[in-house]
A protein has these predicted regions:
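Active-site-proximal segments of metal-dependent phosphoesterases and phosphodiesterases across multiple
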Residues: 1-32, 39-48, 214-218
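Binuclear metal-dependent phosphoesterase catalytic core
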Residues: 39-143
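Short, solvent-exposed loop/turn segments at conserved positions within beta-propeller repeat blades
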Residues: 84-86, 176-179
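A short, structured loop/turn motif at beta-sheet edges
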Residues: 94-100, 156-159, 188-193
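Extracellular ectodomain segments of secreted/surface proteins
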Residues: 131-157, 172
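Ser/Thr- and Asn-enriched, surface-exposed coil loops between beta-strands
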Residues: 153-162, 219-221
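Conserved aromatic anchor
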Residues: 158-178
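Recognizes extended acidic, P/S/T-rich segments that occur
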Residues: 167, 177-222
Length: 222
């Protein structure tokens, strides 16, 4: 977080612009604490401002992501995904003699690595290459053949409706192709205003039976 709220002792104002100061040093790697976003989200690293920003997850509190989503059970506004309390993540940072930095993401709840084949890699030039910018290549996910949307009439009221649908399948297992959320569009049959709702996907769920609770992942080979 490098916003007007988080200037720390550097102070606020045009003479104390923390972003402009950090942009003079593209090799900076700024890590934000007190963060609850999921480390599976590829956007947890960003270089679009001219330096590297990383959010480091939560060790033992709860997941909380961006606003604009709804709870899939109640339909109310939600920033916390389902079972958000199943959260314990962190980072292992390796710094090499040539100046290269590799950041490995860990799930402490299961003792496993998060995208183990995709460590975030920052060269000695830092953010100049903007590898982790706003625009990153990805391939759309697909729903299974014959997939359809279900409609639960028993749970339908004058201002709400319950729908079900099968999970989509990502194009592959790479981080940029992770399915982050679903957007549901509903338009009245006889015309009227279209309603849009979004809900988080369960991409942050650890695989059942993998690892041990509270364990640190086995050391990666160098």
């Amino acid at each position: 977080y490098v916003t007007n709220e988080w200037y720390g002792e550097y102070g606020a104002g045009t003479d104390h612009d923390l972003v402009k100061l950090m942009q003079q040093y593209p090799q900076i790697i700024q890590v934000s604490g007190h963060s609850h976003a999921t480390l599976e989200d590829a956007r947890s690293i960003d270089q679009s401002l001219g330096y590297t920003s990383i959010q480091d997850g939560t060790i033992g509190a709860y997941f909380e992501n961006e606003s604009g989503k709804v709870d899939p059970i109640t339909g109310t506004a939600a920033t916390r995904p389902a079972d958000s309390e199943l959260a314990s993540q962190g980072l292992l940072v390796d710094v090499y003699r040539d100046g290269t930095v590799k950041v490995h993401r860990m799930n402490f709840a299961t003792g496993t690595w998060i995208y183990p084949d995709e460590p975030w890699t920052i060269t000695a030039d830092g953010a100049k290459a903007n590898v982790y910018g706003k625009n990153r290549p990805s391939t759309p996910a697909m729903f299974p053949d014959g997939a359809s949307v279900g409609f639960d009439t028993a749970k339908t009221t004058g201002n709400s409706a319950a729908v079900t649908f099968p999970a989509a399948k990502p194009a592959d297992g790479t981080n940029n192709n992770m399915i982050h959320s679903y957007r549901i569009t509903m338009t009245p049959k006889n015309g009227g205003e279209t309603v849009y709702k979004s809900a988080f996907n369960d991409y942050y769920y650890a695989k059942a039976g993998v690892g041990a609770a509270g364990a640190v992942p086995t050391q990666k080979s160098r």
